[in-house]
Amino acid sequence: MKKFFLLFLALGAVAFAGEGESMIKAYSVVAAGVGLGLAALGGAVGMGHTAAATIAGTARNPGLGGKLMTTMFIALAMIEAQVIYTLVIALIALYANPFIG
């Protein structure tokens, strides 16, 4: 009985082998959406913490406000760069997928 079950599983894989490309496309869309959503969420949390720390530092020592703002903008650019890198990877997965022949 086990041998027949394994045979049917093997034949099922052969029967549906032509649908592999559409499954890769579907999973690429899901992966791009989830990846970009998580990257945006992480970026938003990181930017919020950066802004809160800058505001707290400026409140403690107003004389350092300019230097803190400069450092904050550099940190925000680095955080946003991570989200942009995720967007580039998602666009590659959607439009130039290396797994689709």
UniProtKB/Swiss-Prot annotation:
Main location: membrane
PROSITE patterns, sorted: ATPASE_C
GO terms under cellular component: plasma membrane; proton-transporting ATP synthase complex; proton-transporting two-sector ATPase complex, proton-transporting domain
Keywords annotated in UniProt: ATP synthesis, Cell inner membrane, Cell membrane, CF(0), Hydrogen ion transport, Ion transport, Lipid-binding, Membrane, Transmembrane, Transmembrane helix, Transport
Keyword Transport: yes
Key word Transmembrane helix present: yes
Cell compartments where the protein resides: Cell inner membrane
Site residues, Reversibly protonated during proton transport: E80
Gene Ontology MF terms in the entry: lipid binding; proton-transporting ATP synthase activity, rotational mechanism
InterPro entries, A to Z: ATP_synth_csu_bac/chlpt (IPR005953), ATP_synth_F0_csu (IPR000454), ATP_synth_F0_csu_DDCD_BS (IPR020537), ATP_synth_F0_csu_sf (IPR038662), ATPase_proteolipid_c-like_dom (IPR002379), F/V-ATP_Csub_sf (IPR035921)
CDD domains according to UniProt: ATP-synt_Fo_c
Name used for this protein in its record: ATP synthase subunit c
Taxonomic classification: Bacteria, Pseudomonadati, Campylobacterota, Epsilonproteobacteria, Campylobacterales
